[in-house]
């Protein structure tokens, strides 16, 4: 049997299988810490739009719970499109983006149907919309979990992980201890969370653990044992994945190019992710960052300093009408040729480059080319 299969994953139960530094969810393999890093891209600001979504939905669900029978249909009509939109958003978030979603939409329609609302009102002694509440509660808890986790772990990444000179399991353990156990400002942030008591953050997540047996992909005669972790709350799922990742030397980091959070799995100090660079879609952030770094280094290179000075003067002469368009074009071409030769030939760079880059020489050679 393949690892990561026959799991039960819904909005109120999340299951992952752990093997070495990998985790398996819905039959797919991920590095430990993947979900904790990716979810940071979905929320994290103090006044995040997610907070408004939580507030609006909570108010409507509360109204539906206490409303008279005659008013419940109108409230449900307001709640249903907002809830449908929220479910759609959740299915873009990890880990739910890897799950089947059709049954959830069907359950939503049934839970908020007029027939079901009327039936619950008549059959329930407290007249509560039982099915609606049982459907909405885990969704609201997930939203709060995402908001709380992202706000807190973004702060952890910025204040602790980002400053580390070494990125390994030992350094991550020390950073987690300093942040979660000793940092008063982090504890104050915990206390000030708008819905902190709903989905409380603990660095020791509450999970159910067991074991799962699976066949080796390379040799079906061999069987192995993975740890199965079951979480009844999304906050515990994300925290476990974060701490499991840190334990294996994996940690979230923010790309200096596009601003997205990504997972690092080695000891290198990260700067850029492998996503598409927003500055130029032809490159990844890593490629674009390397190119810009090289460009900055080039500015300090003696060959480039002289080249930039001369070409700047040529352009100014052209702007002031001292040289023609054709002479400008040929002069710039020659300057680039001398620069490239100097970069390839150290002897020329040390002796002939400065002489050839004199303006009088460049203009004289350019005029020869125009004849």
Residues covered by each model-derived region:
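Short helix-coil boundary/hinge micro-motifs
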Residues: 1-265, 294, 298-318, 330-342, ...
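Cysteine-rich micro-motifs
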Residues: 267-288
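A contiguous, mid-protein "functional segment" used to position or interact
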Residues: 291
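Charged, low-complexity interaction regions
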Residues: 319-326, 347-348
């Amino acid at each position: 049997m393949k690892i990561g299969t026959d799991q039960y994953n819904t909005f109120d139960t999340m299951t992952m299988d752990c093997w070495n530094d990998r985790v398996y969810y819905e039959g797919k393999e991920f590095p430990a810490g993947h979900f904790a890093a990716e979810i940071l891209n979905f929320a994290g600001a103090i006044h995040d739009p997610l907070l408004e979504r939580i507030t609006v939905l909570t108010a409507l669900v509360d109204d539906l719970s206490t409303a008279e029978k005659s008013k419940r249909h109108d409230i449900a009509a307001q709640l249903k499109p907002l809830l449908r939109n929220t479910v759609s958003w959740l299915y873009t978030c990890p880990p739910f983006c890897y799950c089947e979603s059709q049954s959830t939409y069907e359950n939503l329609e049934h839970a908020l149907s007029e027939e079901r609302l009327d039936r619950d009102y008549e059959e329930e002694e407290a007249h509560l919309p039982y099915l609606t509440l049982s459907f909405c509660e885990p969704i609201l808890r997930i939203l709060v979990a995402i908001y709380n986790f992202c706000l807190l772990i973004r702060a952890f990444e910025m204040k602790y992980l980002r400053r580390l000179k070494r990125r390994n399991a030992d350094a991550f353990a020390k950073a987690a201890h300093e942040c979660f156990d000793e940092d008063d400002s982090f504890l104050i942030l915990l206390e000030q969370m708008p819905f902190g008591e709903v989905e409380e953050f603990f660095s020791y997540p509450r999970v159910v653990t067991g074991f799962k047996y699976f066949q080796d992909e390379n040799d079906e005669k061999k069987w192995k044992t993975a740890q199965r972790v079951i979480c009844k709350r999304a906050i515990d799922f994300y925290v476990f994945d974060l701490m499991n990742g840190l334990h294996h030397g994996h940690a979230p980091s923010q790309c200096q190019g596009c601003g997205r959070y990504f997972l690092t799995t080695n000891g290198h100090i990260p700067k850029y992710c492998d996503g598409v660079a927003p500055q130029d879609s032809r490159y990844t952030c890593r490629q674009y960052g390397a190119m810009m770094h090289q460009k900055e280094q080039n500015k300090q290179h003696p060959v480039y300093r002289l080249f930039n000075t001369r070409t700047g003067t040529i352009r100014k002469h052209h702007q002031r009408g001292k040289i023609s368009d054709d002479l400008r074009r040929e002069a710039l071409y020659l300057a680039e040729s001398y620069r490239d030769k100097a970069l390839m030939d150290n002897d020329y760079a040390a002796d002939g480059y400065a002489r050839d880059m004199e303006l009088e020489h460049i203009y004289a050679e350019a005029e020869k080319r125009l004849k």
